[in-house]
UniProtKB/Swiss-Prot annotation:
One of its GO terms (biological process) is L-proline biosynthetic process. ATP binds at residues 14, 171-172. Belongs to the glutamate 5-kinase family. Substrate binds at residues 52, 139, 151. Signal peptide: none annotated. This is Glutamate 5-kinase. Pathway: Amino-acid biosynthesis; L-proline biosynthesis; L-glutamate 5-semialdehyde from L-glutamate: step 1/2. Its EC number is 2.7.2.11. The lineage of its organism: Bacteria, Bacillati, Actinomycetota, Actinomycetes, Frankiales. Residues 275-353 form the PUA domain. GO terms for cellular component: cytosol.
Length: 371
């Protein structure tokens, strides 16, 4: 038995589209009800369910034979399918005496400070009221440029958002193998304690899903995200949902490799693509990396990209290495006149709104360790 599972009081479970849908792509209510029966929380335990399946559930009603490739049709399918998905969850959990609440998140909700606080407060209150949050990315409004992109990473972010004790990633594969078990002999990797345990492994082609976007590679990345922030994660199949939550030794465990930190910083480090780059001198690199200071304009030597205030940008050292990533406080077009200058000088010339950081330390995450 695994005491870190049986002792967990707040658990996030993620289920993929392939575990909830028929071969034709529609919602399989029987499979959904079986999943609900398997993940019902124990007395004193709180459950958060991150569920894919909205787009897949919308395919059949819209007469679509397969998952659409264009964002607009995906959003239409999500809009149609989400209501059906949550209605089915509400009915299944309701028969067991549990209330559910729908929560749709976008990347903005976990990266902007005010959105992040509001999302965390809302989820905490739902759990305090003994409600099971059913979470999905808000596919109907998320843009291609700023979206989480798969529910595996969203689940890892949510696990930190709610300070979960455990993250369980369910799919159609019962764990991580050293080769594709469908193509030949393979050995399951039972435990991952560091990235070196993943050396030489391939994660392509290990699933059968045709209606989702998450494969084994995204599950590994999500488990690493969770572990790097102090949350234990397990990858296993939906068929193993009940055994894994009972503490049986199934699936692959990713043990914590770091301490807990804000979910939005994990999102910055693992799930964002930078919109630009700020080149720093050696003094600014030392301030940001070693002293964990905010980035001031005096230490910036160059700007790349066409970004807006609030976008993620990489901070680059004189050797061209990205040492940190943060949310920039100014548009790219505003920065050239600010480079290499003190905030006091800028305030005198351009006004008091320029007497502030380019990237605040609270909006910054290191990509390389301090040396």
């Amino acid at each position: 038995m695994r005491p870190f599972v049986t002792d967990a009081r707040r658990v996030v479970v993620k289920v993929g589209s392939s575990s909830l849908t028929t071969a034709a792509g529609g919602l399989d209510v029987d499979r959904l009800e079986a999943l609900v029966a398997a993940v019902l929380p124990r007395a004193g335990q709180q459950l958060v369910l991150v569920s894919s399946g909205a787009i897949a559930a919308g395919l059949a009603p819209l007469g679509l034979a397969r998952r659409p490739r264009d964002l607009a049709t995906q959003q239409a399918a999500a809009s149609v399918g989400q209501s059906s998905l949550v209605h089915s969850y509400a009915a299944a959990f309701g028969r067991a005496g549990h209330q559910v609440g729908q929560v749709l998140l976008t990347a903005t909700d976990v990266i902007r400070r005010t959105h992040y606080r509001n999302a965390r407060t809302a989820l905490d209150r739902l759990l305090e009221l003994d409600v099971i949050p059913i979470i999905n990315e808000n596919d109907a409004v998320a843009t291609q440029e700023i979206r989480v992109g798969d529910n595996d990473r969203l689940a890892a972010i949510v696990a930190h958002l709610v300070s979960a004790d455990l993250l369980v990633l369910l799919s159609d594969v019962d764990g991580l193998y050293d080769a594709n078990p469908r193509l030949g002999p393979a050995t399951m990797v039972r435990e991952v304690r560091s990235d070196t345990d993943l050396d030489g492994l391939t994660a392509r082609g290990t699933g059968t899903a045709g209606v989702g976007v998450g494969g084994m590679a995204t599950k590994i990345e999500a488990a690493r995200m969770a572990a790097s922030g102090g949350v234990t994660a397990i990858i296993t199949s939906a068929a193993n949902a009940a055994p894994v939550l009972r503490g049986e030794e199934v699936g692959t465990v990713f043990h914590p490799t770091g301490s807990r930190r804000a979910s939005r910083l994990l999102w910055l480090a693992h799930a964002t693509a930078p919109e630009g780059r700020l080149h720093l001198d050696s003094g600014a690199v030392a301030a940001v990396v070693r002293r964990r200071a905010s980035l001031l304009p005096a230490g910036i030597t160059g700007v790349e990209g066409d970004f807006a205030a609030g976008d993620p940008v990489d901070l680059v050292d004189p050797d061209g290495r990205s040492v940190a990533r943060g949310l920039v406080a100014f548009d790219a077009a505003e920065l050239p006149v600010m480079l290499g200058r003190s905030t006091a000088d800028l305030a005198m010339e351009l006004g008091p709104s320029y007497e502030r950081e380019i990237v605040h330390r609270d909006d910054l995450v290191l990509l390389l360790p301090a040396r």
